[in-house]
Amino acid sequence: MYRCSWKEYIFAVLFILGVFSANIGYHFMIAGEDLALIGFFMIPAGIIISFVSVLARIRIHDQAVPVTQLEGIRKGIVSSMGMLHLNLLSALLCANAAMTLLTGILVSKAIENYNWGSTLSFVVVVIIAVFLLQDQSMKAHDLKRLEKMQTESEKNVS
């Protein structure tokens, strides 16, 4: 079973801080002229921190899972399935942070009651979820094919 390392926890905390920074920056931009400049810099900083922490967490996870043998591939697929909901949550929050930036810049104050950023981030997350699920189903299909090849080679040997 795959366990998170302390590095992943640190990047998860950085990720939450990045998204929090981006959303607070958006509210600073709306609040007024004095805080708008601070908010303008907080939003991209939060988005960059969020994306870097997600990429680092995925990289740490991929290095921790062995994929050299069939058993390693099986463990990798199982742990990737476990990480799927975390990656979807990460994608949701990153998309929300990115759309917060677009909302703050493109949407005027007259229509700020409707949160366009949430709608767009939902669409982005659905697209990302479809790609992630397709990737997981392809890995599961490859695992079944590898197991079948292994059983056939064992039959041929004996």
Which positions does each model-derived feature cover?
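Cytosolic-side membrane-entry/anchor segment at the start of a transmembrane helix
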Residues: 1-16, 134-158
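Juxtamembrane/interfacial segments around transmembrane helices
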Residues: 62-70, 91-99, 139-151
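Short, flexible coil/linker elements and helix-boundary hinge sites characteristic
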Residues: 31-32, 76, 109-115, 150-157
